[in-house]
Structure formats: C-alpha cells, structure tokens
C-alpha cells in the first residue's frame, strides 16, 4: 500500500496531462450536448470535465389532439375532467348506534339445514325493538359522548311498566326439508313457527314476557262465567303467541323463498332486572330472543334458527328514583318522540290564552220570557245596598217614553272617572224580588222588603218598572213593552229618584256593575223556557212555571237593567 494517496479519487478521471495519453481521438468523435452553461472550477487541461463532451439535442414532439369529425373551434384548449365528488360526511353516529342497539343479531343455527336436494339452506331474520328505550348512564362508566360508542358510556334501559313491540320479517327457503343431527341422521321438518322469549344474563334463566291486552275484561263479563276456574283463567297473564310460518301462505311471490312479517305489540317484561347500578359484577340484563322452531316428523320441537337483542336493563321503580342518572333518549325510539311532543306542548301552553270573562259579558243574548212588572209602592231600604251621587235628576220633559233597546256595559274594561263631580246621574243597586209568580210581587207581609229601581243614560229612551219582594233575592228589572203604561212608570221612576237622593253614598267611584256582572245565557232550540237569577259573577237557570209561561207568551223581557255607565 506504499505510495497510495488517500486523497486521490481513482474512480474519477486521471489527473495526468492529455499530452501524455495515447489515442485521444475518441473524444472528438463524440457529439456535444446542449447543457446549461455551468463552468467547472477545475482546469480543463488537467481534468476531463463535462464541458468537453457534446451530445445531440433531441427535441420532444408536441402532443396533438386526434382529429374529430367536425372542425374544433378551440384546438388549443383541452377538455378538463370533472373532479370526483367530495366524499359525503358520515351521518350522525348516534343514529347508527341506536339502530344497532335496538336491532337483533345475526342468525345462529344450532343444526345443519338441508333442502330437498340435500344442499345447505339458511334462514334470514330481520327484527327491531320499538318502545320507550333510552341510554342510561352507568355509575361505573363514563358519561356518553358523541364520539364514543354508547356501549362504553351507557346501556340500553327501559322501565318495566312501559310497553314495547317487535317488528320485522323472517325469510325461509321453500325447499327447506331436513335437519342433520350430531349423529348424521336426517330428520324431516313438518312445520315451522316463530317464538319470542327472554333470558337473564347472570344465570341464563328464562324471563317471562307478557302480552298486555287492549282492554281489561269487565267485571260483569267475568261474573257471567261459572266456576272459580273460569274466573282464574281470565286473570292469567298471557304470553305472546307464536307466529306460524306456513310455506303455502307466504306473502312473497318468490318461488324459492317465503317472507313472513313479524309484529308483536303491547309486550311487557314481567319482572325488572336486579341490582340496577349497585354492583357491576352483579348487574343483571335481559336479552330478547327470537327463535324459529321446527316441528320434526318424530313430534319433537327444536329451534333451528335464533337471533337475540342487545342487553337491556329493566327498571322497576319510578323515574324519580333515577333523577341523578343521565338519560339519553334514542332518536329512533318512542322516548325521543314523547320528549319532543312534551316540549312542543309546553311551548303551546305558554302562547295559548284562555277566553276572558269580558268577552262573555259583551255578548248579547235575546230571549222571550213573561213580564213580572207591578206597580208596588217602594219602601225605604238599608244604606248598604244603595248607591247614589251628588247630582239630582232633571225633571222629565215628556210623559210618553218611547221604547228602545239599550244595554248597560258591565265590563271591567270600561274606564270610570274617579271624581264625583263628573257624574251627572245616579244609580242604585238594591235587592228585589226574582219570583216568577205575580203573587209574590204583592206579598208585603215581611215588612223589610226592598225597593228595586234602575236608571239609564237617557231617561227619555227607557221604560222601567219597579218590583218589590223578599230581601234574600237580588235585583231584576224588566222593561215594559206597551207604551200605555209609560205614564205610571215615569211617575214611579221620579218618586224613587227623589227618595234616593237622601241615601248615603258608600261607594262614590264605583257603580253596581263592578260588583255584579251579568253573563248572558246560551239558549238552544231544545231547551225549555228558563229565567235567570241575577247573582254575583254567575247566572243560575230557573225553570218557569207552566201557567206563567202560557199567560205571558209573546212578551219580551230583559234579564238585566240598563244602568248608567260613564
């Protein structure tokens, strides 16, 4: 290794002079290359660099479009391809998880199934739970989130009293004929049926599922049965019946397969699961199982296909015992639908307004009833029933008062002035006789009868009559229809008005209609003639005597007086 220079690079060109080399004509025979102008840092005479090498320049051919059958107006433009559509965002994972929680598993075959040609056959079962199911937070797991699967943070839960149903379909091959036992024997199949049952997860024991009837048997129907055995049988809880799978009655027109619908409604767990949230290792779950049971030629029944639901926790107590838990309703279950319905009902109740009493007070109802006016002498009444003002009534200008229909405004919406000097007329509210017989109006044996008067806004437009009666009845004033009695009525009216001016004024800023409002009666064609008893905030119906109604038929009557309202 003596004389070896470690800095020399033998794999490169030799650093010897070109003059000492023999046969260098091969360098001139090579064609030059059109390379970028990059000069070497080394001496060209001592090193063989790329500058001394030339190569032929090859120009690439331009791409040309194939000629089409028509003249292209834009030959330079190349049609651009449409980009692939963007991938759609995945749907909400909770919906998929909810469907998986409420649906059943893949079919499991305990036996090998064969058709008439001794080929293997299979059965398809597609079913789903429906009802008040929700995801309940477990005390030993984390709370459910949107990204985490519900199985990690919550479990499918329902209450025992809530009803549920199972819907779906089952498809069987029409050529299904044999089952193969463990010993290799072929046993023919005679019939098929679909059953529903449930088991618990701790020991695998069966759990009873009952079918709740639409209507409980009436007591009288149960009494018709003879014997205690019949009454006891009516109270026995019934299990959901099996669905027969008859190949001849299949709804599908397919020649190879028969499809049968599944519909079990109003199902209920008979008992609840134990240890709801107390100890994880002892938490009990219920599993709903659907089985296709085959009846063999030997008379034995055996399941040939089975699917099962997810584990379900059944609560037996009231929801208030689980208020500390977080419940997440499933979007595909009835729990979410009821929750949305309750929220909508609550919003409607906030915006809904009930009809006010003022609308009823403004309604005018006309009816015909006998008139009970009489020319009784008014007597003095206690000051507690009287209302008067500081002004006096002007004398009447005419003795003939034309009849008019003017009603008083008994409504809380009417605004009344507080000052007493703004009132120009007076009104009085006193108890009067409400008897429907004329004999009661002339009965003055009690000695403490009350006067009954009423005023109007326009004295020239009203005809009033005064009645007297027992003190236990309230005021009722009727308008007389004939104008012949207007003179006597006006005289009684003026005498009563002058007497009222001497009475004390217990309420100066209120009138009688504030304390006693009239609510008109709703009359129907089928109702008999009735009379209204004028009481505070209520109107009572009183049947009229037949003789009174016959004598006064055709006359009109008012149930309230047109009082002065300002």
Curated annotation (Swiss-Prot):
Keyword Transcription in annotation: yes
SUPFAM superfamilies named among the record's database cross-references: p53-like transcription factors
Localization per Swiss-Prot or TrEMBL: Nucleus; Cytoplasm
InterPro entries found in the cross-reference section: Fungal_trans_regulator, NDT80_DNA-bd_dom, NDT80_DNA-bd_dom_sf, p53-like_TF_DNA-bd_sf
One Gene Ontology cellular component annotation held by this UniProt entry: cytoplasm
Annotated spans, Disordered: 314-422, 448-470
Compositionally biased intervals (Low complexity): 333-349
Xref: PROSITE patterns: NDT80
Residue ranges of the annotated DNA-binding region, renumbered to this chain: 79-326
Coiled coil, from the record: none
First-listed, main subcellular location of the protein, grouped into a coarse class: nucleus
GO molecular function: DNA binding; DNA-binding transcription factor activity
GO BP of this protein: meiotic cell cycle; positive regulation of transcription by RNA polymerase II
Alphabetic keyword roster: Cytoplasm, DNA-binding, Nucleus, Transcription, Transcription regulation
Domain of life: Eukaryota
Compositional bias (Polar residues): 365-391, 403-413, 452-466
Free-text function comment from the UniProt entry: Transcription factor that acts as a positive regulator of nonrepressible acid phosphatase activity. Is a major regulator of responses to nitrogen and carbon starvation and is essential for the expression of genes involved in vegetative incompatibility (like pin-c, het-6, and tol). Vegetative incompatibility is a non-self-recognition system ubiquitous in filamentous fungi which results in programmed cell death.
PANTHER family to which the protein is assigned, alphabetical: MEIOSIS-SPECIFIC TRANSCRIPTION FACTOR NDT80, PROTEIN PACG
Name recorded for this polypeptide: Protein pacG
Source organism (scientific name): Emericella nidulans (strain FGSC A4 / ATCC 38163 / CBS 112.46 / NRRL 194 / M139) (Aspergillus nidulans)
Lineage: Eukaryota, Fungi, Dikarya, Ascomycota, Pezizomycotina
